[in-house]
Amino acid sequence: MATTKSFLILSVMILATTSSTFASLEEMVTVLSIDGGGIKGIIPGTILEFLEGQLQKMDNNADARLADYFDVIGGTSTGGLLTAMITTPNENNRPFAAANEIVPFYFEHGPHIFNSSTGQFFGPKYDGKYLMQVLQEKLGETRVHQALTEVAISSFDIKTNKPVIFTKSNLAKSPELDAKMYDICYSTAAAPTYFPPHYFATNTINGDKYEFNLVDGAVATVADPALLSVSVATRRAQEDPAFASIRSLNYKKMLLLSLGTGTTSEFDKTHTAEETAKWGALQWMLVIQQMTEAASSYMTDYYLSTVFQDLHSQNNYLRVQENALTGTTTKADDASEANMELLAQVGENLLKKPVSKDNPETYEEALKRFAKLLSDRKKLRANKASY
């Protein structure tokens, strides 16, 4: 009798624990963030291809797409372009690009995007005409409200001196943000000195003309948009009726995948205090952006890692980043075939590397674990919706 009673108690405990785990997973808000970095977008493109492939295997569905699994997908610069590629609908209302089409996109169009150098010292390095052409061709007349999941794409308005964040959740209050995706993608990629700023106009809720004068989203969020994506997810959880059960969102209820485009350790070894003490404005101008982006990326990752660890939810956050780029792979605009091949190899090799010195788990293993959480959560929500 005692044995039977003990068995019943154990069974109830296991059931309660399992139910609690499933309920917790079902309530998770899932966020994907993709850094900027020009042609180095090949690196996160490789990671996204691996992740989507794992999801397709787990769910036995060759048509599974990343937009089916993430509540918010955010990006800046080339990360904004990737965001649009995997969330913009085609004629069948499915993402127009599968993840395995991202790297081929860079190989096909990268050399043309970064090949129209104006050769002017006082002007942008590239005219941006081919970039706009291919964006219009691929994205058509699609606007923000048509994205297949919530998006968060940043830019910076040089006339108002304010960041501009394009998201679906802002449209009710600010319909002027319902811009065409190709305008948004060009704007978030219009890095000063590389491409000309972008002007376009939409209409306000009163029908008045609303003008944008935009440059690269990295000016607003630097290169790592993870905190921006988290902020958009938090707002959605507070305002969207579909997320009523998790209005009090905290990091324990979030799954965050942040993809970098690589940094270099060579840069840190190149310059010393003794050398830079002799620098003038021009020399600092050439490297200050790289310094700022690297520092911001490290600090964003440090902050998020600390928060998730303090909440004992470190497995809810995964930052995938290569920190030892060398040679031509450090350049955002080297679209030579040889360099693009190197970048693709960097992405492949990254999967085999440990997540950190303190975590021997490889990125491949971590992404498989992350994919399992995404897959299980999607199934739980689908089952709930069927009742």
Curated annotation (Swiss-Prot):
<feature type="short sequence motif" description="GXGXXG">
    <location>
        <begin position="36"/>
        <end position="41"/>
    </location>
</feature>
<keyword id="KW-0443">Lipid metabolism</keyword>
<comment type="similarity">
    <text>Belongs to the patatin family.</text>
</comment>
<feature type="coiled-coil region">
    <location>
        <begin position="361"/>
        <end position="385"/>
    </location>
</feature>
<feature type="domain" description="PNPLA">
    <location>
        <begin position="32"/>
        <end position="230"/>
    </location>
</feature>
<feature type="short sequence motif" description="GXSXG">
    <location>
        <begin position="75"/>
        <end position="79"/>
    </location>
</feature>
<dbReference type="InterPro" id="IPR016035">
    <property type="entry name" value="Acyl_Trfase/lysoPLipase"/>
</dbReference>
<keyword id="KW-0175">Coiled coil</keyword>
<keyword id="KW-0732">Signal</keyword>
<comment type="function">
    <text>Probable lipolytic acyl hydrolase (LAH), an activity which is thought to be involved in the response of tubers to pathogens.</text>
</comment>
<feature type="glycosylation site" description="N-linked (GlcNAc...) asparagine">
    <location>
        <position position="115"/>
    </location>
</feature>
<keyword id="KW-0442">Lipid degradation</keyword>
<dbReference type="Pfam" id="PF01734">
    <property type="entry name" value="Patatin"/>
</dbReference>
<dbReference type="InterPro" id="IPR002641">
    <property type="entry name" value="PNPLA_dom"/>
</dbReference>
<dbReference type="GO" id="GO:0005773">
    <property type="term" value="C:vacuole"/>
</dbReference>
<dbReference type="GO" id="GO:0006952">
    <property type="term" value="P:defense response"/>
</dbReference>
<feature type="short sequence motif" description="DGA/G">
    <location>
        <begin position="216"/>
        <end position="218"/>
    </location>
</feature>
<feature type="signal peptide">
    <location>
        <begin position="1"/>
        <end position="23"/>
    </location>
</feature>
<keyword id="KW-0325">Glycoprotein</keyword>
<dbReference type="GO" id="GO:0047372">
    <property type="term" value="F:monoacylglycerol lipase activity"/>
</dbReference>
<dbReference type="GO" id="GO:0004620">
    <property type="term" value="F:phospholipase activity"/>
</dbReference>
<protein>
    <recommendedName>
        <fullName>Patatin-01</fullName>
        <ecNumber>3.1.1.-</ecNumber>
    </recommendedName>
</protein>
<keyword id="KW-0611">Plant defense</keyword>
<keyword id="KW-0378">Hydrolase</keyword>
<dbReference type="GO" id="GO:0045735">
    <property type="term" value="F:nutrient reservoir activity"/>
</dbReference>
<feature type="active site" description="Nucleophile">
    <location>
        <position position="77"/>
    </location>
</feature>
<dbReference type="GO" id="GO:0016042">
    <property type="term" value="P:lipid catabolic process"/>
</dbReference>
<feature type="active site" description="Proton acceptor">
    <location>
        <position position="216"/>
    </location>
</feature>
<keyword id="KW-0926">Vacuole</keyword>
<keyword id="KW-0758">Storage protein</keyword>
